[in-house]
């Protein structure tokens, strides 16, 4: 099966989320995908300092946005996700996720870069946030990637066309029955009467996050995943296997 939504390149992304508690103020920085670590860190530091409150001893007219060297970012948790896309068997890829939680009183951009680039490869992430995976799928596979190809992309070449078709058909059927008004679903009938279901680009990330992931994690069973005896395993277990990189 040809895979127009995939490539054999190796990709590395730095993703981050930040939670900070200070004076009963909590904010969560939306996770993003960056192809450049420095872009990710710069954006993160910008967001941190945008929400920073000035110290009581300092004047409100001071410019705090550029003072990232001061140890005044307190009580925050930083979660870094370094995703390595490892090509195998031609056009198919697998995800390897590395996480590095950071707790501290102060952390600078150079330190964050160091942590991302030197994260221990043995620290495999076993709980991959759904919102990040949704962004990964949306970013990695084009917005109009049909669901059959998406199933093949995620599970690799050992999933049969029949299994991929069954998964995509059931997903679409459920959406059409329950959420037709909220999701602009389209189908295309070619000369070989093969249905290709696609989601409207404006709804694609929401579609992946709310439907693709739950279906893949909980409601389907596939067999013969490459290199593992995962016969009759639930997709929740397969999901953990898939993100583990093994």
Curated annotation (Swiss-Prot):
Taxonomy, superkingdom: Viruses
Name assigned to this protein: Uncharacterized protein R187
């Amino acid at each position: 099966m040809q895979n127009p939504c995939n490539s054999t390149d190796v990709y590395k992304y730095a993703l981050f989320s930040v939670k900070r508690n200070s004076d009963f103020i909590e904010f969560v920085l939306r996770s993003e995908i960056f192809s450049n670590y420095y872009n990710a860190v710069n954006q993160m530091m910008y967001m941190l300092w945008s929400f920073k409150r000035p110290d009581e001893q300092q004047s409100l007219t001071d410019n705090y946005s550029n003072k990232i060297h001061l140890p005044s970012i307190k009580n925050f948790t930083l979660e870094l996700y370094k995703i390595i896309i490892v090509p195998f068997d031609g056009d198919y890829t697998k995800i390897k996720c590395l996480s590095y939680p950071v707790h501290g009183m102060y952390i600078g951009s150079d330190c964050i870069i160091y942590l991302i680039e030197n994260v221990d490869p043995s620290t495999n992430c076993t709980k991959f946030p759904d919102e990040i995976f949704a962004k990964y799928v949306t970013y990695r596979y084009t917005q109009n990637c049909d669901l059959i190809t998406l199933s093949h992309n995620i599970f690799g070449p050992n999933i049969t066309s029949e299994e991929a078709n069954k998964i995509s058909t059931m997903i679409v059927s459920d959406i059409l029955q329950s959420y037709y008004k909220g999701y602009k679903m389209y189908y295309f009938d070619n000369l070989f009467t093969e249905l290709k279901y696609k989601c409207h680009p404006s709804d694609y990330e929401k579609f992946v996050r709310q439907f693709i992931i739950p279906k893949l994690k909980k409601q389907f069973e596939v067999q013969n995943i490459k290199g593992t005896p995962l016969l009759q395993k639930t997709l929740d277990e397969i999901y953990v296997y898939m993100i583990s990189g093994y």
